[in-house]
């Protein structure tokens, strides 16, 4: 099992190229199921979750090829499927497999999708997906660990309806967007998620011929069409990777330009970093961060977009750990999302968990130790902590990191970090 060995204490300087967003690429790979034409995706990140999704749709019969000279380009052709099924063996490590449910139902009238795995950060139920697709006319049963869905006899398409979810659900909104694009009539999504990745998926679907209005707001209208065609689409830049590098520079100090970063997708995080003492400037296709000395600790509360993202909570906590002053971090989205805390404490952080909140007292220095990653964003937070800790930090179980970060250690090395992958 690979590990990362980090020698802390170096400031960071240079340029980092931000990759395409994992949370946009995964639904967009599934969107290729909606057409028999060729779909070309550009700026697709090289991640374990993306590799798993490609394996999944290939298993269904989709032709999917990465460009040899342009590895960020993936060409997809779902002319016919051999099997509209997402088996447990392929999806047990990745929750995003549920995104195949809507497209398969909409185009082929049937789908068998394993209940998803992939995250250790609390229950993320798929009941909202099932309720919404049932409202559109699908018959769905859950048995033996699978969601088995089909259209009723004699019904050729899903039906447009109004769907109001009990809570804001990102993957639910994406599933309904894709399913409704080929449904009969109009679908209205109330309480829709507003994340930039959803807007990017909607932009791709519109290029394919979908009729969608209101994406980026809480109310999305989709007028179903009989067929969608192919398109070429560039995956939006990863705002969480961007935020992770911003926190790393704020913690370690330095002057770094993030190419392709979108400041307008990270307002809540950038506001907190500026309050902490970092100087951040942004323009078309770049963000620059300059940080010197200890930052000031910042309290925050995670909420749905455009609020502070839960996917940035752990990374900002790594910054707070060595910042001046005390802070309170409140997690409102997921349970079990403080699993990185025990590992940070091993490095010398002062953190107390009080229900849904973590109360932190910044320390002047952390000291290197062996720590274990527990989930994707927790692993990133431990890397940031390792960059500022005295001595050597060894981060174990970094397969979590590989699920969501494209060559993170190489990018950090490129801006001056002393970090290397240790092959087991």
UniProtKB/Swiss-Prot annotation:
CDD domains: UdpNAET (cd01555)
GO molecular function: UDP-N-acetylglucosamine 1-carboxyvinyltransferase activity
Pathway assigned to this chain's UniProt record: Cell wall biogenesis; peptidoglycan biosynthesis
Annotated binding of UDP-N-acetyl-alpha-D-glucosamine, by residue: 95, 124-128, 311, 333
GO terms for biological process, alphabetical: cell division; cell wall organization; peptidoglycan biosynthetic process; regulation of cell shape; UDP-N-acetylgalactosamine biosynthetic process
Leading EC class: transferase
UniProt xrefs under Pfam families: EPSP_synthase (PF00275)
Binding of phosphoenolpyruvate, residues: 22-23
Catalytic activity: phosphoenolpyruvate + UDP-N-acetyl-alpha-D-glucosamine = UDP-N-acetyl-3-O-(1-carboxyvinyl)-alpha-D-glucosamine + phosphate
In-chain residues carrying the UniProt-annotated modification 2-(S-cysteinyl)pyruvic acid O-phosphothioketal: 119
Protein name: UDP-N-acetylglucosamine 1-carboxyvinyltransferase
Source species of the chain: Polaromonas sp. (strain JS666 / ATCC BAA-500)
Assigned keywords, A-Z: Cell cycle, Cell division, Cell shape, Cell wall biogenesis/degradation, Cytoplasm, Peptidoglycan synthesis, Pyruvate, Transferase
Subcellular location, record wording: Cytoplasm
Function text: Cell wall formation. Adds enolpyruvyl to UDP-N-acetylglucosamine.
Cellular component terms (Gene Ontology): cytoplasm
């Amino acid at each position: 099992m690979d590990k990362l060995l980090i020698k802390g204490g170096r400031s960071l300087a240079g340029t980092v190229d931000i990759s395409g967003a994992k949370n946009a690429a995964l639904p967009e790979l599934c969107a290729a199921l909606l057409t028999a034409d060729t779909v070309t995706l550009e700026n697709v990140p090289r991640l374990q979750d993306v590799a798993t999704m490609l394996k999944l749709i290939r298993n269904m019969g989709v032709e999917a090829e990465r460009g040899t000279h342009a590895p960020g380009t993936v060409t997809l052709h779902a002319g016919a499927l051999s099997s509209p099924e997402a088996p447990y063996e392929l999806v047990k490590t990745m929750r995003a497999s549920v995104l195949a449910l809507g497209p398969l139902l909409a185009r082929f009238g049937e789908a068998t999708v394993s209940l998803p795995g992939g995250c250790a950060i609390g229950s993320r139920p798929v009941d909202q997906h099932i309720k919404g697709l049932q409202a559109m006319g699908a018959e769905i049963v859950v048995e033996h660990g699978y969601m088995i869905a089909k259209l009723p006899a004699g019904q050729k398409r899903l039906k447009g309806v109004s769907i109001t979810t009990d809570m804001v659900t990102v993957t639910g909104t994406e599933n309904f967007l894709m399913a409704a694009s080929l449904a009969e009539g109009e679908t209205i999504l109330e309480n829709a998620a507003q994340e930039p990745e959803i807007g990017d998926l909607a932009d791709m679907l519109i290029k394919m011929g979908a009729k969608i209005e209101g994406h980026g707001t809480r109310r999305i209208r989709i007028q179903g069409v009989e067929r969608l065609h192919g398109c070429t689409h560039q995956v939006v830049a990863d705002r969480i990777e961007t935020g992770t590098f911003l926190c790393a520079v704020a913690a370690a100090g330095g002057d770094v330009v993030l190419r392709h970063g979108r400041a307008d997708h990270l307002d809540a995080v950038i506001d907190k970093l500026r309050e902490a003492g970092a100087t951040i400037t942004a323009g078309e296709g770049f963000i620059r961060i300059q940080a010197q000395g200890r930052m000031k600790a910042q309290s925050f509360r995670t909420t749905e977009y455009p609020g502070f993202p839960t996917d940035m909570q752990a990374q900002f906590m790594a910054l707070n750990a060595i910042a001046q002053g005390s802070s309170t971090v409140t997690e409102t989205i997921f349970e079990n999302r403080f699993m990185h805390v025990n590992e940070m404490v091993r490095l010398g952080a002062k953190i107390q968990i009080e229900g849904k909140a973590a109360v932190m007292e910044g320390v002047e220095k952390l000291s290197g130790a062996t720590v274990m990653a527990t989930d994707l964003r927790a692993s990133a937070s431990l890397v940031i902590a390792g960059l500022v800790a005295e001595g050597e930090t060894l981060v174990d179980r970094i397969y979590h990191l590989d699920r969501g970060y494209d060559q993170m250690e190489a990018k950090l090395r490129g801006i001056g970090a002393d970090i290397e992958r240790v092959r087991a």
